[in-house]
Amino acid sequence: MLLQKREENAITLAATATNGRIIEQALPDKYPVAPKKKIIALAALILGLGIPVGFIYLIGLFKYKIENAEDVQKLTTVPLIAELPHCQKPAQGAIVVRENHNDIMEETFRGLRTNLLFMLEKEEKVILVSSTQPGEGKSFVAGNLAVSLALLGKKTLIVGMDIRKPGLNRVFNISHREHGITNYLSDPEHTDLFSLVQPSDIHSNLYILPGGAVPPNPTELVARPVLDSAIAQLKEHYDYIILDTAPIGIVTDTAIVSRVGDLCLYVCRAEVTPKVAYQYINELK
């Protein structure tokens, strides 16, 4: 019986024996087949650089306001003649240019003044100051530029041509705000233009012609030839005339008034002026 079992086991082992045999011993490769470390590192590098750059690019696409001078230079070929630093609201009004002072704001306005004088021809006297929308510092720039010219010894007049919303009233201490250029434009035959001019308490060379009472027809008023006559008269008595005009992106008044100006100074403000506003600048070139 035992012999029979042994024979059966031998037959079973013979039937299940493998047909294969080891010809040569296998050796492990020096480098793994997977994962590919170099490919993973390269992909990580590309994603690590690409995702932040793409994110920043997308943020830039959604920003519709200028941030610095580089944005301005990309959007227009009009020369950038000055960069004003941010100014905290001064304790006394909005005039930061003073005689015998040399802080950074006053030096900046001196630079602006110098550049403008280089751009003006000999007989050109009228500088028009505008912006795209309210809140960009147009009247602030116009007022301090006028003071800077007065400190140069030039007889300077600043005229409030933003007759819908006079900004000079917030810049200067004007005693009779209801009397101004609109009175003359409305009734030139019975109004003395020079009686509307007020001396400034800032400097003896600085004079102010306020906007006056807000008229019901401002656009028609500035379109009249009497404005040309008024500016011609003023040019005979003053070395420089600064026109503080309305924001050109809001109303058409400034485009009409620009006919009497020799040079247009366009004020932009970082984080306020929209990039689309530069279509107005390029149209005014």
What is the role of each PLM region?
Residues 245-250, 261-278:
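Conserved Switch II/interswitch segment of TRAFAC-class P-loop GTPases
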Residues 20-41:
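Short, aromatic-rich amphipathic segments at membrane interfaces
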Residues 155, 204-207, 235-243, 253, ...:
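Loop/turn-to-beta-strand initiation segments
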Residues 128-130, 210-211, 242-244, 265-269:
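Conserved beta-strand segments of the P-loop GTPase G domain that flank and frequently precede/overlap
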Residues 20-24, 81-83, 128, 207-210:
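Soluble periplasmic/extracytoplasmic beta-strand elements of cell-envelope proteins
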Residues 1-25, 69-71:
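Non-transmembrane alpha-helical coiled-coil
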Residues 36-157, 161-182, 186-190, 194, ...:
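Short boundary/hinge segments that flank catalytic cores
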Residues 211-251, 258:
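Phosphate-binding/switch loop-helix module in NTP-utilizing enzymes
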